[in-house]
């Protein structure tokens, strides 16, 4: 990976139509990168090229569709040519809140399809180009990968899987000079915050009377607490700036917290007992 910052280098970013991914793509472009972005959402991405002065191109790509991934990666690989790809930011992800007992299994599977298997498909498809450039992969995990929360089970579990995959990829790719970094954001204020609030409301409204008797009260507390901590989180532009720092950092970090809340919580996870963590887990989720 070249020491030259940005200029003349290339990056691919998934989940880039809005939110954190969009800011990452734009800030990489501002640093001189040529950015190949993708997202499953088209209508929210029309201004990316204009906003980046033509430095960002966006492909409508569903990362859970193997053929779509192969087509996008082939197009990008043709564009970068013999130089290969310098950076891949694997950012695409979704959030499926709710009590594990009542969430449809298909919803949990879909979260893993996007957050885990889709990410793996993109990473593996880009590896030949990344090996050529001796590039860097930045996988966007979350602090909940180390500190799972009640009513956030599928997301926490998928992010924990990314933690394990990061360790394995880092070891397997070291002989090729490809670096693998796991970014661990805390709470973020993005244009997806309203979507999360709507998802929480849909779960509550879909509960049967029996499910409400079991979980309604605690889920309402969680929803209120979750909305509060999200509103107090790092803004997407600030988080993206930190991600760009991680992209450029020499030497590459193994893991990197994004936001003061993530730094504090991950330190707590390292230092405290399981009993302390269980108590904090419920308190953080607004349940104690």
Model regions and ranges:
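The beta1-alpha1 cofactor-binding region of Rossmann-like NAD(H)/NADP(H)-dependent oxidoreductases
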Residues: 61-74, 105
């Amino acid at each position: 990976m070249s020491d030259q910052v940005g200029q003349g280098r290339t990056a691919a970013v998934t989940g880039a139509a809005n939110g954190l991914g969009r800011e990452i793509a734009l800030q990489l472009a501002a640093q001189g990168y040529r950015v190949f972005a993708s997202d499953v959402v088209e209508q929210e991405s029309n201004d990316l090229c204009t906003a980046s002065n033509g430095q960002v191109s966006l492909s409508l790509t569903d990362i859970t569709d193997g053929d779509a991934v192969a087509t996008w990666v082939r197009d990008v690989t043709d564009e970068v040519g013999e130089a290969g790809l310098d950076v891949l930011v694997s950012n695409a992800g979704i959030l499926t809140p709710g009590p594990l007992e009542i969430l449809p299994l298909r919803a949990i599977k879909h979260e893993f399809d996007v957050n885990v298997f889709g990410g793996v498909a993109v990473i593996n498809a880009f590896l030949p180009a990344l090996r050529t450039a001796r590039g860097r992969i930045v996988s966007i995990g979350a602090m909940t990968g180390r500190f799972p929360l009640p009513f956030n089970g599928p997301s926490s579990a998928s992010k924990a899987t990314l933690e394990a995959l990061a360790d394995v990829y880092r070891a397997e790719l070291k002989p090729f000079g490809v670096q693998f970094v796991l970014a661990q954001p805390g709470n973020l204020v993005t244009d997806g915050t309203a979507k999360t609030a709507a998802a929480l409301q849909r779960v509550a409204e879909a509960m049967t009377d029996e499910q409400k008797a079991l979980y309604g009260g605690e889920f309402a507390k969680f929803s209120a607490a979750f909305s509060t901590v999200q509103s107090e989180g790092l803004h997407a532009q600030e988080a993206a700036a930190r991600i760009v720092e991680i992209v450029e950092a020499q030497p590459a970090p193994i893991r990197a917290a994004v936001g003061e809340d993530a730094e504090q919580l991950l330190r707590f996870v390292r230092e405290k007992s399981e009993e302390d963590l269980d108590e904090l887990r419920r308190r953080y989720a607004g349940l104690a």
